[in-house]
């Protein structure tokens, strides 16, 4: 795992971990990252440690080197159903993650910036996309336009709908 295991809260990998990884590989062990993050959210300094593979997006994708072993995508219908649900229930802060990027709502962008996070700069800039700026072809839907393996949402302290209701209402797709 990366967060809180391989790297600290500032995404710094200690020298002891770097040494341990190198020693394990020198002794013939294969090293894999297993993370909830999508690959575009893994910092270059972590990937540069030379892992043999990555299990990412909470197990929805697996790669060995540059070879994709499998990838589970959220169906276009599920994305569209969730987006309609978010709109209906005034859920403004959500994101979708996949191998080609992170797609975020304006509410999620505000959330990141309120935490001092720079979402569209540095090594990750090309992977971040505001959902409102996605060019959805005529006759298509967002669900058919983006390819993602994971989504999440955040509500305020008094949401219009409970987590349990959301879980129940979106159960046909998730």
Region locations from a protein language model:
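Residue immediately C-terminal to the conserved phosphorylatable aspartate in receiver
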Residues: 2
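Conserved acidic, metal-coordinating active-site core of Asp-based
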Residues: 97-174
């Amino acid at each position: 795992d990366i967060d809180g295991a391989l790297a600290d809260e500032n995404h710094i990998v200690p020298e002891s971990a770097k040494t341990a990884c190198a020693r394990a590989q020198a002794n013939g062990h294969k090293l894999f990252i297993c993370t909830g993050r999508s690959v575009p959210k893994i910092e270059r300094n972590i990937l540069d440690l030379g892992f043999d593979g990555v299990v990412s997006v909470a197990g929805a994708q697996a790669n060995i080197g540059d070879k994709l072993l499998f990838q589970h995508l959220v169906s276009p219908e599920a994305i569209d159903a969730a987006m309609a649900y978010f709109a209906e229930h005034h859920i403004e802060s959500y994101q979708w993650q996949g191998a080609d990027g992170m797609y975020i709502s304006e509410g999620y962008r505000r959330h990141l910036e309120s935490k001092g996070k720079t979402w569209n700069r540095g090594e990750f800039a090309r992977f971040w996309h505001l959902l409102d700026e996605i060019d959805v072809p005529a006759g298509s839907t967002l669900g058919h336009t983006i390819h993602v393996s994971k989504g999440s949402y955040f509500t305020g302290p008094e949401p219009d709908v409970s987590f349990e209701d959301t879980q129940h209402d979106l159960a046909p797709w998730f």
